[in-house]
Amino acid sequence: MTQAVELRDSVDAGRLLAEAARIVRNQPYCWLATSSEAGGVRVRPMGKISFNTDAWTIHFITDGRSRKASDLRRTNNVSIVCGREADDAYIALIGTARLRENPSEVRERWKSAYNTYFPTELDKENAIFIEIGIDSIELWIRGFTPEPFGMHTTRLQRDAGGWRVTS
């Protein structure tokens, strides 16, 4: 029996999801990776504004004039990486981004905390929300993933029936 098969038999997807959620929830920042127009990868730190574990969505706010917004208009496949070095816990969330650019929706969802990043009226007019629906998760969490730590990835995939461990 391979280690991946043993892992599927011994690890509960719900337990892995709960641990992944705990790590993501407790990290104020994560790394968002998008594809550039030249085909490369762009990665930047982002502050989460919300994280919904029922729907497995993460929301960010950004400037609609930014390179990341341009990248997401071109292709909406993204990866988000969060980690907690003290716990040897690292999570890669893979999903699809949706830009929420409707000015009335942006005004409705606006919080005064965003004024720090969008200080002028012109900045506020160009603010947009990014909603990312997570479709798969890759985990490296000591005590949850196989040893030697970091050598094997534990993957969760979401389908119509919910989440399942795939490796």
PLM feature spans:
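Charged, gly/pro-rich active-site loop segments
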Residues: T2-A13, A92-S167
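Short, basic/aromatic recognition patches
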Residues: E6-Y29
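A short, Trp-centered hydrophobic/proline-enriched beta-strand micro-motif
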Residues: R22-E37, V78-C82
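A generic structural signal for short beta-strands and their flanking turns/coil linkers
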Residues: N26-P28, R44, D54-W56, R74-V78, ...
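Histidine- and/or cysteine-centered catalytic micro-motif in compact active-site loops
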Residues: S35-E37, M46, D63-R65, G83-E85, ...
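Short acidic (Asp/Glu) patches
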Residues: P45, T62-S66, T75-S79, E108-P119
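A short mixed-secondary-structure module that forms the rim of ligand-binding clefts
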Residues: I49-D87
